[in-house]
Regions:
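C-terminal "closing" transmembrane helix and its immediate cytosolic amphipathic cap
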Residues: 2-13, 278-288, 301-361
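Alpha-helical transmembrane segments and terminal signal-anchor/GPI-anchor hydrophobic tails
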Residues: 11-12, 219-285, 300, 316-318
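Juxtamembrane loop-transmembrane helix junctions in multi-pass integral membrane proteins
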Residues: 19-25, 43-53, 82, 191, ...
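Kinked, hydrophobic transmembrane alpha-helices enriched for aromatic residues
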Residues: 21-48, 58-61, 65, 88-109, ...
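Hydrophobic alpha-helical segments with transmembrane-like composition
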Residues: 54-55, 62-63, 69-71, 101, ...
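Residue-level signature of transmembrane alpha-helical entry/exit and packing/kink sites
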Residues: 56, 81, 89-90, 142, ...
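Membrane-interface helix-boundary motifs at transmembrane edges
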Residues: 75-85, 158-169, 212-224, 276-286
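Central hydrophobic cores of alpha-helical transmembrane segments
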Residues: 169-180, 225-234, 291
Length: 361
């Protein structure tokens, strides 16, 4: 996930399935599923129903995993230390990938349909988006909003933890977020760096961290496990269908905003269940370790490939193009990630963001 490396990667009294072979294979799998969902959700040609389901959970999942990755000691660290560590881990990549996106935009903004899309916009407008950190104004690469958004979320959680323990913090934040969703009008005036949606996102962050420190894990097997899975799947599908297309980045919480949190929670539970059932693999590990590279670069890679295809006369995109473009974005990140980690690891916020257990080196 897009988060600082752990200070102590040992889980606190973990259930046995969560850690295998010296790595958190459970986390690797969940991060891998999450980043693949992000790419699939942004590639053209995706069926509308699939996009609706992906958007119902993919960004809340990332906030949840970021909270899970926060070690208990760092949750209690002084605010200054949290500010410096989180700034290095998130804002340095934000600056770097914004610069990469700006160069790509300047090189391609006058090509094809992009000429009309970006008519009247210049570098000053792009820099304005960088300052606000809002997806709608980061037109050169809208996904970059997540970097400042997670930065604010982590700082907000750090402040709350000065007052409450993990369980009480989760309860207080959940009540406040649900009250906001239930009793406030639709978001019209956006605040920079996701300061408005941070109150919603931090609930998932707090839930992830509470799950880690509590070591809670339901013990189901056989028919009970399958029945629980079917109930959660049915609830998720029903809630997502009721909600329609949501988008946390744009403060769009669906047709019934109060259902945004439970719908995302059901989706997260399904991903976690799937993650625990997957065997460890080098592919999942690679996707997990390089999610920080895939996340900001996949829109540029997809745009480059789709633009090239259109210049060759490719027609409207369907499911096959959707799959191929998604696969291209993931495969193209293999050499890019290697180059970045080999030569300029500093731009990723740390020499290595993989979950390496203490003493393994």
């Amino acid at each position: 996930m897009l988060s600082p490396p752990l200070e102590d990667t040992r889980l606190v009294a973990p259930p046995a399935p969560l850690e295998r072979s010296g790595r958190f294979d459970f986390i690797d799998a969940a991060k891998a599923i999450g980043i693949v969902l992000v790419v699939l959700g942004h590639a053209p040609g995706a069926p509308n129903g699939v996009v609706t389901l992906i958007y119902s959970l993919h960004m809340p999942l990332f906030f949840f995993l970021s909270g899970y990755l926060l070690s208990p000691s760092r949750a209690q660290a002084p605010l200054r230390a949290t500010l410096l560590r989180t700034g290095r881990a998130l804002l340095v990549p934000y600056v770097f990938f914004f610069a990469v996106s700006l160069v790509y935009w300047l090189a391609t903004r006058d090509l094809g349909a992009r000429a009309a899309k970006f008519a009247g916009l210049d570098t000053a407008d792009a820099l304005h988006g960088f300052v606000t950190g809002l997806s709608a104004e980061l037109f050169i690469n809208p996904v970059l909003w997540f970097f400042p958004g997670l930065f604010v979320c982590q700082l907000l959680y750090a402040v709350v933890r000065r007052v409450f323990d993990a369980r009480t913090a989760l309860a207080a934040l959940a009540v406040f977020a649900l009250a906001l969703l239930a009793f406030t009008p639709p978001w019209t005036l956006r605040w920079p760096w996701g300061l408005d949606i941070a109150w919603i996102a931090v609930v998932f962050f707090a839930a992830g961290h509470w799950w880690r420190v509590s070591a809670w894990s339901p013990r189901l097997s056989g028919p009970a496990e399958w029945l629980a899975a079917l109930v959660v799947i049915a609830a998720w599908l029903a809630l997502a269908g009721t909600q329609g297309r949501v988008d946390l980045a744009h403060a769009n919480f669906g047709n019934v905003p109060l259902l945004f949190v439970p719908c995302a929670a059901a989706g997260i539970v399904l991903v976690l269940g799937a993650a625990q059932s997957l065997p460890a693999s080098s592919a999942l590990r690679w996707l997990s370790d390089n999610s920080l590279v895939i996340f900001p670069l996949h829109p540029l890679l997809i745009n480059a490939a789709s633009g090239a295809a259109k210049s060759l006369g490719a027609g409207p995109y369907g499911p096959l193009a959707w799959v191929l473009l998604s696969a291209w974005a993931l495969v193209a990140c293999v050499p890019i990630a290697w180059l970045l980690r080999r030569f300029v690891p500093e731009v990723l916020g740390a020499p290595r963001l993989a979950l390496t257990p203490r003493g393994a080196a």
